[in-house]
Amino acid sequence: LLFVTGDLAAQNIHLSTPRTSLVLSAPAGGELKYVYYGSKLTENDCREVYNAPTMQHGAYPVYGMNCPGESALAVTHADGNMTLQMEVAGTEIKNTDGAVTAVIKLKDKVYPFSVNVCYKAYSDVDIIETWTEIAHAEKKNVMLRKFDSAFLPVRRGDVWLSSLYGSWANEGRLVQEPLEPGMKVIKNRDGVRNSHTAHAEVMFSLDGKPQENYGNVIG
C-alpha cells in the first residue's frame, strides 16, 4: 500500500512504501521540514507524530540567514550576494504507475530563485527516491557553489557507516565504522571507473554494528 495525505491548511505530506513512511511539513510561506522517517505509520500514527513535541529539521537547508549547520545548497547571486532564504511556494502530488511523487516548490523571499524538492515513493519496494530541480530568472548568471541532491538528518546514536573502496584487482573492499561527530567525506574522481577507488554508495546501520540478518538500515 502506498498513499499520500495532505492537510490543506498545514500542507502536511505523508509518503509511504510497503514498510516505511516519510512525513514532511510544508506550510505555505514557511520552511520545508522533516517530521518523521522510519517504520510505516498509519494515518492515526501520522497525526500523533505531528502533535508530538519532536525536533523537526530542515529538509533542504540553504546557506543564508541562519546556517549553523551544514547546508545542502549555497549560491552566489548575479549581484554577488550569497544569501538564500527559501520558503514553501506550493506542493504538487503526481500519481504514476506504482509510485507517488511529491514536488515541494520553494522560492527565495527576495530573488527570482527557486528549488523543487522532489520525493518519489514506490509501492512495491521500500525505496523513496529524492532529487532537486534548481532554476532562476536573475539578469545574469548565478553560481552554484554547492548543490546536494538531497539532505537527510540521522538521529545521533550507535550509528555505523558501511562503504566500499578498492584499487585494481582489489575492488569492492568493505569498511564498516561508527559514525562519529564531525564530517565524513567519501569522494570519487574517477568517473565510470569508480570500482577502483571509493564508491559513492553508503549504508547507515541505525542500531549498532551491521548484522547479516537483522537491523534497521538506510542505504
Which residues does each PLM region occupy?
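Polysaccharide-binding surfaces and accessory modules of carbohydrate-active proteins
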Residues: 11-23, 32-219
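Bacterial Sec-dependent N-terminal signal peptides
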Residues: 1-11
